[in-house]
A protein has these predicted regions:
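Active-site-facing substrate-recognition patch
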Residues: 1-52
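PRPP-dependent phosphoribosyltransferase catalytic core
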Residues: 8, 131-178
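Conserved PRPP/pyrophosphate-binding segment of the phosphoribosyltransferase/PRPP-pathway fold
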Residues: 41-94
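Structural motif
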Residues: 53-54, 116-118
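Short, hinge-like loop/turn segments at secondary-structure boundaries
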Residues: 73-74, 94-98, 163-166
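Short, glycine/charge-rich flexible loops or terminal/linker lids adjacent to PRPP-binding catalytic cores
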Residues: 78-117
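Conserved G/P- and acidic residue-centered "switch" motifs that form tight phosphate/ATP-binding loops
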Residues: 122, 127
């Protein structure tokens, strides 16, 4: 099974960034051509009939597969960035983090009410960043929004921050208790 290939190639680093945390390093999946192809193909199969017009990649690892997936779906790519990184007028959403606030932005002309949007990032942990990205995209009055991750850490219950009607899909589900 393809997901087993991904799990086999996923690097875990104990006690990073602090003691007691098991860090899942997706960069090992990006560097392997077979894994990269599996991820793009699996995501394409899931979303190919959903009418996606724009893929929004979340800074920065969401850009990696976001671009490849957008091309395969025949959709445009929008980059959701931290403040000060986009040159034109932006729309933003500020959200709470464990130790303060953060903000995510996209260009004001990036989306419209006719778009069907796929939000993509590498990892679902607590869900705060992606929930903010979803609220940001909703400000444009888009037709539909889908949320996707390469990997979900199930112990952290991040999917619970999304409204029940949000379609949340993760290629891989992992546990910090492995």
């Amino acid at each position: 099974m393809n997901k087993q290939v991904l799990l086999k190639n996923l690097r875990t680093i104990p006690d990073f960034p602090i003691k007691g945390i098991l860090f899942f390093d997706v960069t090992t999946l990006f560097k392997d051509a077979e894994c990269l192809k599996i991820m793009v193909d699996e995501l394409y199969e899931y979303y190919k009939d959903k009418g996606i017009t724009k893929v929004v990649g979340i800074e920065s690892r969401g850009f990696v597969l976001g671009g490849a997936l957008a091309e395969k779906l025949g959709a445009g790519l929008i980059m959701a960035r931290k403040p000060g990184k986009l040159p034109a007028e932006v729309v933003e959403e500020t959200y709470e983090k464990e130790y303060g606030k953060d903000t995510i932005q996209i260009h004001k002309d990036a989306l419209n009410e006719n778009d069907v949007v796929l939000l993509h990032d590498d990892l679902l942990a607590t869900g705060g960043t992606m929930a903010a990205a979803e609220r940001l995209v909703e400000k444009f009055g888009v037709k539909k929004t889908y949320v996707n991750f390469i990997m979900e850490i199930t112990d952290l219950n991040g999917r619970n921050v999304f409204p029940k009607e949000t379609d949340v899909y993760s290629l891989l589900s992992v546990s910090e208790k492995q």
